A protein has these predicted regions:
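Gram-negative bacterial Sec-dependent N-terminal signal peptides
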Residues: 1-21
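Active-site-adjacent core segments of small-molecule enzymes
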Residues: 22-329
Length: 329
């Protein structure tokens, strides 16, 4: 895939550049770089600006209680507010843009506890560290002299950041979906499930659409209406529920915990962990999901984060963007 798609894809799932060692970026620096890359749109998200709100429920599989005491897997019906999104900060980007898609879920657990899942439709992230992510954004900044990214800076980024390669390879081989109902979503990061005996298990998860994964052809990408994904999901949920199966991959102690650019071995055990059912879809302006900050570190008892530096960095970055939205900036 070309370097612009790679850089925007990475920006779009979370920004001049030099290849020497640098101090780790702050959350404010990353948000400012996102603004410089895509412009400032007051009151809106700095990344994943385009989205649609959804509502429904989740029913977890009781068998998962062997691994976690989380109320998500009690077998009860858990109310869900969610948001599908298109990665990037351009409010005019068409839905056929070859960027990652996001699915953020807020689960309302018994006792008024809240738990968030914040997923992407790619199995790996485009950076192992916040520095790589930041450098990717900077490498795609427009050169003032040309109004376009500098090819030499982009080339330098690719040559000096091998952790960006797995996402680039995946994006090059996979077109956008025909429908939000036909996308699978990945946890990206590794998490810890903690059971009633305080035993910890490493896990990743994957939401698989009941109707299967279906992608646009190259020809279709050039003919689809700008907001076809939103329109399609609204129409589908009016006709009936749309579902995903949550598949849980059970890790081993030797598996990578802190690098979201590395795949786990394909032979790891996978079990069904629950079913997500969506029954409504609404344009996001003024809807329930619009003001939610889907911080992936908002977790209830029984699930905990790893020390993945990207996962840990997402929380302050989301907060910095959220504050700007709340203040109308």
């Amino acid at each position: 895939m070309n370097s612009k798609i790679l850089s925007v894809a990475m920006a779009a799932v979370f920004c001049t550049f030099n290849a020497t060692a640098q101090q780790a970026p702050t959350a404010d620096q990353v948000v400012s770089a996102l603004e410089k890359l895509s412009g400032v749109h007051p009151g809106e998200r700095r990344n994943h600006i385009l989205g649609i709100c959804v509502g429904g429920s989740f029913v977890g599989t009781k068998d998962v209680q062997a691994f976690t005491r989380s109320a998500l897997f009690s077998g009860a019906t858990i109310p869900v507010i969610g948001r599908f999104s298109l990665a990037g900060g351009n409010p005019k980007a068409p839905d056929a843009t070859k960027n990652p898609r996001g699915l953020a879920l807020q689960f309302k657990l018994p006792g008024n506890s809240i738990h968030h899942f914040t997923m992407l439709n790619v199995p790996v992230f485009g950076a192992a560290t916040p520095q790589t992510f930041y450098n990717a954004l900077l490498s795609n900044m427009a050169d003032p002299a040309t109004g376009k990214p500098d090819p030499e800076k982009q080339k330098q980024f690719r040559e000096t950041h091998p952790d960006a390669k797995p996402l680039g390879e995946f994006m090059a081989k996979n077109n956008p979906p025909v429908s939000y109902a036909n996308i699978d979503f990945f946890s990206i990061h590794t998490f810890k499930f903690i059971n009633a005996n305080n035993q910890t298990t490493l896990v990743r998860w994957h939401f698989v659409p009941e109707d299967g994964v279906k992608r646009l052809t190259d020809a279709e990408m050039g003919t689809m209406p700008a907001r076809f994904l939103d329109d399609d999901l609204i129409a589908k949920t009016k006709k009936g529920p749309v579902r995903w199966n949550m598949m849980l991959t059970i890790g081993q102690d030797s598996d990578v915990q802190t690098n979201p650019t590395i795949y786990w071995p394909a032979e790891r055990k996978t079990i069904q962990a629950g079913v997500l059912t969506l029954t409504s879809a609404t344009l996001q302006k003024g809807a329930d999901c619009e003001k939610i900050n889907f911080d992936p570190l908002v977790m209830a008892d029984g699930i905990a984060p790893t020390d993945d530096p990207i996962l840990q960095f997402r929380s302050p970055s989301y907060a910095a963007s959220f504050v700007k939205r709340l203040t109308g900036n």
